[in-house]
Amino acid sequence: MHMKLILNLLVLLAPAAVFAAGGGHGDGHIPTSTIMFQAINLTILFAAIIYFTKDAIVSFFAGRKAAYLEAAQKSAFAREQAEKEFVDIKNKLANLDQTREENLRKAQTHAEDLKKQILEEANDVTKRIKNDAELTARLEVQRAQKELRTQLLQDSVEAARIVLTKDLGSSDQQKLQKDFINNVGV
């Protein structure tokens, strides 16, 4: 790298040294030999610049080309992905519009079925509660009637005992015993 730099500087500064050595002023004619030497020096300069920098220039532009191609590929891939996503979203929107009515109908049907099921369960629970209440009421009435009968019998027996012990004489007792023996058959 240093060698190329030194050589480039020498090629650039050599014409300056040549012109400095000339020192004289020419007459009014066109110095074709001077122009010729300058053209040759300029050609040598450009040839040297091209010779020593062509690898760097070629690699620079090759790198730029590779970077550009890579960016173009990424851009093309991103565009393809975006187009695919666009088509996918467009299809989903079209499908959503088509299935919206069907989904609403299904939801309404499901809601109606659920409503019917809840009403049926509520009716079943209501009937069960009503039947249980009626059964409980009947059982309570029967129990109350039984208790009343038992109480009535106990009160009747007690009243009969009191009446029999106070008002019953020995002739009445003998008559009752005969009736008891005849009815029971002992």
Curated annotation (Swiss-Prot):
Chief place where the protein resides: membrane
InterPro entries: ATP_synth_b/b'su_bac/chlpt
Topology within the bilayer: Single-pass membrane protein
Keywords on record: ATP synthesis, Cell inner membrane, Cell membrane, CF(0), Hydrogen ion transport, Ion transport, Membrane, Transmembrane, Transmembrane helix, Transport
Regions crossing the membrane: 5-25
GO CC annotation terms, alphabetical: plasma membrane; proton-transporting ATP synthase complex
Protein localization: Cell inner membrane
UniProt xrefs under CDD domains: ATP-synt_Fo_b (cd06503)
GO terms, molecular function: proton-transporting ATP synthase activity, rotational mechanism
Pfam families, per the entry: ATP-synt_B
Superkingdom assignment: Bacteria
Annotated HAMAP family: ATP_synth_b_bprime (MF_01398)
Subunit details: F-type ATPases have 2 components, F(1) - the catalytic core - and F(0) - the membrane proton channel. F(1) has five subunits: alpha(3), beta(3), gamma(1), delta(1), epsilon(1). F(0) has three main subunits: a(1), b(2) and c(10-14). The alpha and beta chains form an alternating ring which encloses part of the gamma chain. F(1) is attached to F(0) by a central stalk formed by the gamma and epsilon chains, while a peripheral stalk is formed by the delta and b chains.
UniProt-listed PANTHER family: ATP SYNTHASE SUBUNIT B, CHLOROPLASTIC
Biological role stated in the UniProt entry: F(1)F(0) ATP synthase produces ATP from ADP in the presence of a proton or sodium gradient. F-type ATPases consist of two structural domains, F(1) containing the extramembraneous catalytic core and F(0) containing the membrane proton channel, linked together by a central stalk and a peripheral stalk. During catalysis, ATP synthesis in the catalytic domain of F(1) is coupled via a rotary mechanism of the central stalk subunits to proton translocation.
Record-stated family: Belongs to the ATPase B chain family.
Protein name: ATP synthase subunit b
